[in-house]
């Protein structure tokens, strides 16, 4: 590229940047604040150098998002939060994200009563400003006399510690319009019986800790009659109790009920069997499910001594079968009124709701996996698309396999088979 061309390109880029900046400068402050709401507070403050009219606009953004490396020292952090919350104190605050975790790691201080007092004071302030999104990381809640978060719709608790079970329960019950709750647990959060009781909750995600040395058996109890989307990723929780599950639509589960290779499922443990039975019954009405190989193994072991429930509404299943348990799939899709469920795909039953099947693992065992393909194609009444992947086959083997696939009859006339 010659010098004139390079100069033209450079000028064009410079003009584009100026044009975008000029366009932003013309936006009204109210709209700018909504744009800046999606940025970390540190970056919003930096925008003050871009325009003389933006010097203090960061103070008017209806949200605070503070993280790692934002402050040279702890006192500066406290002073900044106080200053921000004190400005426009009568205006509504949409988001409040406070991350103590990285600050603690950076400055190596221990949690003190002063920290408790600061967090309590800030939360009381954002409550008055009708905060809707509350994101807290690595803070500690003392035992409150009462909790009232009347406007909080979204709550994210990351490694948050509580005085006891009751303190957590009061926090959740104090949010009458809560719609989305995400919890990433700490091994020392002081909550053994985690009870989520909410009349408004629509989505709940629970991520467990990685401490395999837990002695106490932890329990999670969910009573949320409007809950539609449930995600559980926690191996260490021993018991799950789901009340009022009728509204559940989607589930993503990676749980082991505190079982392991050392502590396997015991068919003589009747309380554990009853709990798993009730859990499976509670989730059997879902339409979409993702399930891990860990959970499938527990269910498989359970199914050898108890009948599995009917998942009559299931239309989408993403299952990680690892290297085994392909034969479990029919158990998730049986129609009502059949004989007790067999793990083998023998019974004559259709899949009335299944529309899409995507098998992510490449085919390597032709006979076993061809039976699986046959099951889906021959039993799915409204199947639209089946996608599969081939492993490393020789040319002749691959050609023979594809011919066999083409000869499998399809119950659904509109079904398309895609081979990747």
Curated annotation (Swiss-Prot):
Family annotation (InterPro entries): F-box-like_dom_sf (IPR036047), F-box_AtFBL13-like (IPR053781), F-box_dom (IPR001810), FBD (IPR006566), FBL13/AtMIF1-like (IPR050232), LRR_dom_sf (IPR032675), LRR_FXL15/At3g58940/PEG3-like (IPR055411)
Organism the protein comes from: Arabidopsis thaliana
Residue ranges of domain FBD in the record: 341-390
CDD domains listed in its UniProt record: F-box_AtFBL13-like
Domain F-box intervals: 21-71
Pfam families: F-box, FBD, LRR_At5g56370
Superkingdom to which the source organism belongs: Eukaryota
Record's protein name: Putative FBD-associated F-box protein At1g78730
């Amino acid at each position: 590229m010659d010098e004139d061309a390079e100069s033209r390109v450079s000028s064009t880029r410079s003009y584009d940047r100026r044009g975008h900046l000029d366009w932003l400068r013309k936006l009204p402050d109210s709209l700018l604040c909504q744009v800046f709401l999606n940025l970390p507070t540190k970056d919003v403050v930096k925008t003050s150098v871009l325009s003389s009219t933006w010097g203090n606009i960061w103070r008017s953004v209806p949200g605070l998002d503070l993280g790692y490396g934002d402050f040279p020292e702890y006192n500066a952090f406290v002073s900044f939060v106080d200053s921000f919350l004190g400005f426009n104190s009568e205006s509504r605050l949409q988001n409040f994200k406070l991350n103590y975790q990285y600050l603690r790691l950076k400055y190596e201080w221990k949690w003190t009563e002063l920290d408790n007092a600061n967090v309590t004071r800030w939360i009381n302030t954002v409550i008055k400003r009708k905060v809707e999104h509350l994101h807290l990381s690595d803070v500690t809640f003392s035992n409150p006399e009462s909790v009232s978060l009347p406007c909080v719709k979204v709550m994210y608790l990351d490694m948050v510690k509580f005085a006891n079970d009751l303190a957590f329960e009061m926090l959740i019950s104090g949010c009458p319009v809560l719609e989305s709750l995400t919890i990433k647990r700490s091994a020392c959060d002081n909550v053994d019986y985690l009870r989520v009781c909410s009349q408004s909750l629509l989505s709940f995600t629970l991520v467990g800790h990685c401490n395999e040395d837990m002695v106490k058996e932890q329990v999670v109890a969910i009573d949320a009659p409007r809950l539609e989307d449930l995600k559980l990723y926690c191996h260490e929780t021993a018991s799950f109790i789901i009340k009022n599950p009728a509204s559940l639509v989607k589930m993503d589960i990676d749980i082991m009920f505190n079982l392991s290779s050392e502590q396997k499922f015991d068919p003589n443990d009747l309380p554990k069997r009853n709990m798993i039975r009730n859990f499976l019954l509670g989730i059997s009405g879902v339409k979409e499910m993702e399930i891990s190989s860990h959970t499938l193994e527990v269910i498989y072991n359970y199914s050898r001594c108890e009948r599995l429930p009917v998942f009559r509404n299931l239309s989408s299943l993403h299952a990680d079968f690892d290297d085994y348990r392909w034969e479990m799939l029919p158990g998730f899709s049986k129609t009502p009124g059949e004989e007790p469920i067999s793990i083998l795909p023998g019974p004559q039953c259709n899949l009335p709701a299944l529309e899409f099947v995507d098998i992510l693992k490449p085919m390597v065992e032709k006979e076993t996996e061809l039976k699986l393909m046959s099951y889906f194609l021959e039993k799915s009444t409204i199947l639209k698309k089946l996608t599969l992947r081939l492993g490393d086959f020789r040319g002749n083997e691959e050609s023979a396999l594809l011919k066999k696939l083409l000869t499998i009859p399809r119950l659904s006339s509109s079904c398309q088979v895609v081979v990747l």
